[in-house]
Amino acid sequence: MNTSENRFIVWVDDLDDNAISIAGSKVARLGELRKMGIKVPDGFVVSTDAFYMFMKSNDLEKQISQKVQLITDANDLDQVETISEEIRHLIEISEIPDDLCDAIKNSYQELSFKCSDINLPTAVRSSATGEDSADSSFAGQFDTYLGVTGRQRLVESVRKCWASLFTSRALSYRLKNNLSHENSPMAVGILQLVHARVSGVAFSIHPVTGSKDRMVIEGNWGWGEAVVQGVVTPDHIEVGKTDMRLLEHQIADKQIVSAFDYAEGMVIERKMPKLFREAPILTEEEITTICKTVKAIEDKYNYPVDVEWVVDKNRREGDPVTIVQTRPETVHSNEENESASNKWDPVAYATKYAFKG
């Protein structure tokens, strides 16, 4: 690997929590989890150095700064959206320098060979340096692309992730919270796409009541896109944190599944066969495995967490589940002044927080 690739590409195996400035919090934490012995996807990160190099080579910093200064009211949605579209267009038409482009393509080829799949499906996930911190929840404000195959599509998806740093939601959020645009670089994770039988999110505390002795799991067949889009309600599970005893298990009518279409090379929505619509997505053994993993992550960081998990379609009893993201739990802390009796709405949660970039 040449010098430029060393600057632009870092493998998950070489990351930990000290690499957030290089890899963003999302992918850096995956490296830390792997060092804990927790199963995470294979992959690499296109570093913040690569982002800065792309911005500088296209003289984007000054142009973006000038456009951001035109926003006079962060609450004016039309104004923010107009500027956002202009900035994202600037980024999406800008050329990625050849050496950076080659580094991304070569690393994808190396990952494909490592995973024994010459046209490996990947998850291209934004990983901003200020994302998912305990005091500023960026969850769901940046883009993720599932099922990306081929070197050229991968490069294009990386550029789209960079552009998502300037969505209207992200722009407005930074302006309202006095966060710098110039000091918020975007890294991008390129991760092997797990062949999901089911996927979901798990909390180490109850996200509505704040109860520290209850863990909550939400999930659906396949990937989480159908939940994000609000077309399916996930199963809801509550477990005692101390004894891992199943306390509540609500099985939803899951009519839609997000599945990978190998012919199209993308994740698509399909109708779920009637046999599986009202079937539980997880066995008790899988529920316990997820909860023990989440508890280990909470113990590591010493604060409540929410975790995105995937059960591989080839998983056998006793195997680990795959963790694709972890972050500080912010739902309850952001809503702690609201009534704890509010009814938990899994679709509203997922649309706002889970399964997103």
PLM features: residue spans?
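Conserved catalytic alpha/beta cores of large enzymes that bind or transform nucleotide phosphates
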Residues: 214-306, 311-315, 344-357
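Cytochrome P450 core scaffold surrounding the K-helix E-X-X-R motif
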Residues: 225-229, 332-338
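N-terminal beta-alpha lobe that positions the nucleotide/phosphoryl donor
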Residues: 1-187, 198, 278-285, 290-302, ...
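Segments forming glycine/polar-rich beta-alpha architectures that bind adenosine-containing cofactors
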Residues: 199, 205-206
